[in-house]
């Protein structure tokens, strides 16, 4: 269990044991501006709004997007069904294809999304096999060498700056630590060795045979901060953090993946500025924040791979 100090942000997770599959909800009752960066060949995304009251991450591939509808309905119920334009509760969702790791057709539905929201509490995140990470896996060059992952999170506070990273890694690639060691995925049980998929691909090309890779892979994530950024800065922040995840997941953003990152700001604090801290639309502050957030996200990826 990760404990974090981020007022106004609650997280809940729920799952169906008979799946197993689940959903994870990041609830920000006041709402927060959001940038979405989606890449890869098979993105599963709904909403994609630039302002959200909740982000729903779920298993179940496209069917699991129903969980987000459950979150939306529950928020409407909490508003006693008021539908004024200014009161609309916006929910964006992203899903992973987790059917590879299980033999059932169970998927996160409206009831499960609603349950994840009901379980949302401030300051706590269930790590590992919980929520959307129930049947996540990594290193799917050959299914016999695939390993189960989970969901991971990391938090960092620097003065008034708060950064929370949440991730459900379900990639074709492997999880790699800062020493360059493969720590999850593509595991040979006979030798006890995990190896980088590039070696499998090189061997296939050398033998003039098509490389083997399992279909149905996705990594979904969210990076939440309280630092105010312009729309341009927030979009670049999302791209910077998402791109940095290539270090911890290799390969990443492939045609066999469908990766989505939500960058969320609660717009509560401003970083100090000087005449030299920006160049037109370019911001040194946002770049520095993105660099720090990228490390927090790598920590979250490693937590998910434990």
Curated annotation (Swiss-Prot):
Coiled coil: none
Disulfide bond entries: none
Entries under InterPro entries matching the protein: ArgJ-like_dom_sf (IPR016117), Peptidase_S58_DmpA (IPR005321)
One GO MF term attached to the UniProt entry: aminopeptidase activity
Note: This gene may not be expressed. The 25 amino acid residues corresponding to the N-terminal region of NylC are replaced with 76 residues derived from non-coding regions. No potent initiation codons are found within the replaced region of nylC'.
Record family assignment: Belongs to the peptidase S58 family.
Name listed for the protein in its UniProt record: Putative NylC-analogous protein
Organism: Agromyces sp. (strain KY5R)
Gene that produces this protein: nylC'
């Amino acid at each position: 269990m990760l404990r974090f100090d981020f007022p106004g942000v609650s997280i809940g997770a729920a799952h169906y044991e008979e799946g197993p599959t689940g959903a994870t909800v990041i609830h920000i009752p006041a709402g927060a501006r959001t940038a979405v960066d989606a890449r890869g060949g098979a993105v599963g995304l709904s909403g994609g709004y630039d302002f959200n009251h909740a982000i729903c991450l779920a298993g179940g591939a496209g069917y699991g997007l129903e969980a987000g509808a459950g979150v939306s309905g529950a928020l409407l119920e909490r508003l006693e069904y008021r539908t004024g334009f200014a009161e609309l509760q916006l929910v964006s969702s992203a899903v992973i294809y987790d059917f590879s790791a299980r033999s059932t057709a169970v998927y996160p539905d409206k009831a499960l999304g609603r349950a994840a929201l009901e379980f949302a509490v401030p300051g706590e995140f269930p790590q590992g096999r919980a929520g959307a990470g129930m049947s996540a896996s990594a290193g799917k060059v050959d299914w016999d060498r695939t390993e189960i992952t989970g969901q991971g999170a990391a938090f960092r506070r620097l003065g008034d700056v708060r950064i929370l990273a949440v991730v459900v890694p379900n990639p074709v690639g492997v999880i790699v630590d800062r020493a360059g060691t493969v720590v999850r995925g593509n595991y040979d049980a006979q030798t006890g060795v995990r190896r980088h998929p590039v070696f499998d691909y090189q061997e296939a090309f050398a033998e003039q045979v098509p490389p083997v890779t399992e279909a149905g892979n996705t990594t979904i994530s969210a990076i939440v901060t309280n630092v105010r950024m312009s729309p341009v800065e927030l979009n670049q922040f999302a791209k910077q953090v998402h791109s940095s995840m290539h270090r911890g997941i290799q390969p990443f953003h492939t045609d066999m993946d469908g990766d989505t990152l939500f960058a969320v700001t609660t717009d509560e604090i401003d970083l100090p500025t000087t005449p030299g801290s920006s160049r037109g639309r370019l911001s040194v502050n946002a770049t520095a924040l993105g660099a720090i957030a990228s490390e927090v996200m790598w920590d979250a990826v490693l937590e998910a791979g434990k």
